[in-house]
Structure formats: structure tokens, C-alpha cells
Regions:
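Short acidic/polar inter-strand loop motif in beta-rich domains
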Residues: 210-219
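Short, surface-exposed ligand- or partner-binding patches at beta-edge/loop junctions that are enriched
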Residues: 187-211
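Bacterial N-terminal signal peptides
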Residues: 16-26
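Low-complexity, acidic Ser/Thr/Pro/Gly-rich terminal tails and inter-domain linkers that flank the onset
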Residues: 33-101, 230, 236-252
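Short acidic/proline- and small/hydrophobic-mixed sequence motifs that coincide with surface turns
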Residues: 112-116, 130-131, 217
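Intrinsically disordered, low-complexity Pro/Gly/Ser/Thr-rich segments with frequent PxxP/GP/PP motifs
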Residues: 127-196
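Asparagine-centered strand-capping/turn motif at beta-strand->loop junctions
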Residues: 105-111, 125
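N-terminal secretory signal peptides that target proteins for export/translocation
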Residues: 1-10
């Protein structure tokens, strides 16, 4: 009997949490907002979370973050620059494991193969980049950087990471990056400043993307650059309107 009562109480807590989440979103009063399904495990408390992806987006950008999911459910992400929010997305209800359940979808808009992709996670709960509140972030790197990019500007070579698997992201294809694969490293960085369970927001930015042949695109500057002949580690910027392919073939934002 005691077990039945305990199970009943747990069931009521889960139902109440789901109802509260839907009511909260329903009362938000913002046109276009939609209720995101609750992502919570039994016995874990729900909380309001937010996720943003970087702006601006130009028609010459090599890649675009096309989708974010939490627990397999797509969320309405806001827009941000670094750790600063530009326009809010739809808040959603999830448990303390929410960041582990995030997946980032990145699409290659160019006509070249991407061999290394980097995205940066910033945590506004820790700092927004203002005076006295520096940002804290973690860079997720997928694939292997080209040989040319493994040199510092003084000519010394970085130690390659043999644990990284090769990446070959073809034109028009989308890469799914599960944050769960990097959650232990992310947690270690975050907990130097704040208990991990207190993270409620994440801003996701495009970093460096490397192509076959050594060309690079930087999400922070939106510039392409190519290796300088005879100077390992050095790159030459291309024109601001350079794009490898047809910029209208793949949309800049879905």
C-alpha cells in the first residue's frame, strides 16, 4: 500500500509539472509562441530554460545553425551576439539535464566539403561580457583540422588530437552535434564559476570551419581565408563577398 501511495504521489508531481509548464507558456501572451513538450525525467524538477543562436546571418556564410532540439523536440531558439541576447526565443520547461539533451544541427551551404566544424557555447548565467561579468564558454570541435592550421604563427606545430574522428560534411548536408558527447568537459568549465545545475541559458555561436584544401571560414568575422604559401599557420583573407558556390542554393536560415 505504501508503494502504491508513493507511486501515486510521484505521478501527481509529474502531471502537475507538465500542467504548470503548459499554463506558463499559454499565459505568456506572446503571439507565435508555441508550447514546447516537457523534457524531464521522473523525479527531476522542471525549470524555465532559454537557448539562442548567433546573428547576424549573411548570404555568404558558409554554415548556418538550422535547428536546436532538446530531448529530440525542436525548440524556438532566440538570437544572440556572443553572450548578449538580441531577440528572445520561446522559453521551455526542462529538467536539470537539459543541456545534456541538446543537439545542434549545422548545415553546409557551400560547394566544398567541411572537414572540421567548431561551435561555441556561452553561458549568460555566468557573464554577459559586460564590465565585471566576463563570458564563460566552451568550444565543441568536430572532425580534424587541416595540416596547415595546426601551426602557430611562430612556426611551431600543435599536437594533433588523435581521438578525433574524421569529418566529411558534403555540400548541402547537415551535421548533428549532440552536446551529450562533450557534457563532462563543459560541466568542468562551468563549475569553475557556477554550479552546473544553475545553468538555465545557453547562447550558441558558429566558430571556425575548415574545408578540404585548407580554406577556413570564421563565424565571428564572416570571412573566408586561405593558407599563405610558405608560411604555415598564416592565412590570407578573401574578399568580403566571396562565397564558394551559389549563395542562393541553400537558404541562410530555415
Amino acid at each position: 500500500m505504501a508503494n502504491i501511495r508513493q507511486q501515486s504521489k510521484q505521478h501527481m508531481k509529474v502531471v502537475a509539472g507538465m500542467f504548470a509548464a503548459l499554463v506558463w507558456i499559454g499565459l505568456s501572451g506572446r503571439p507565435g509562441w508555441r508550447a514546447v513538450p516537457v523534457a524531464a525525467a521522473t523525479g527531476k524538477s522542471l525549470g524555465t530554460k532559454l537557448a539562442n543562436v548567433d546573428e547576424p546571418i549573411t548570404r555568404f556564410d558558409a554554415v548556418v545553425i538550422t535547428k536546436l532540439t532538446v530531448g529530440g523536440q525542436q525548440i524556438d531558439a532566440g538570437r544572440s551576439t556572443g553572450a548578449r541576447e538580441i531577440s528572445p526565443g520561446t522559453p521551455f520547461q526542462a529538467d536539470e539535464d537539459w543541456l545534456k539533451n541538446v543537439s545542434i544541427f549545422v548545415t553546409n551551404r557551400t560547394n566544398k566539403v567541411i572537414v572540421c566544424a567548431e561551435v561555441e557555447l556561452l553561458f549568460p548565467d555566468i557573464g554577459d561580457g559586460s564590465v565585471g561579468r566576463p563570458t564563460t564558454g566552451y568550444t565543441i570541435s568536430v572532425g580534424q583540422r587541416p595540416e596547415w592550421s595546426l601551426y602557430y604563427r611562430d612556426g611551431t606545430k600543435m599536437l594533433p588530437d588523435a581521438t578525433r574522428k574524421p569529418l566529411s560534411l558534403a555540400p548541402g548536408k547537415t551535421l548533428e552535434i549532440p552536446v551529450a558527447d562533450y557534457i563532462n568537459q563543459i560541466q568542468s568549465v562551468v563549475e569553475e564559476k557556477l554550479p552546473f545545475l544553475q545553468i538555465t541559458r545557453v547562447n550558441i555561436s558558429r566558430g571556425s570551419f575548415y574545408f578540404e584544401g585548407g580554406m577556413r571560414w570564421e563565424g565571428s568575422s564572416h570571412y573566408y581565408s586561405v593558407p599563405e604559401t610558405g608560411h604555415p599557420g598564416y592565412y590570407t583573407k578573401l574578399a568580403s563577398n566571396y562565397f564558394p558556390g551559389d549563395p542562393g542554393q541553400y537558404r541562410a536560415r530555415e
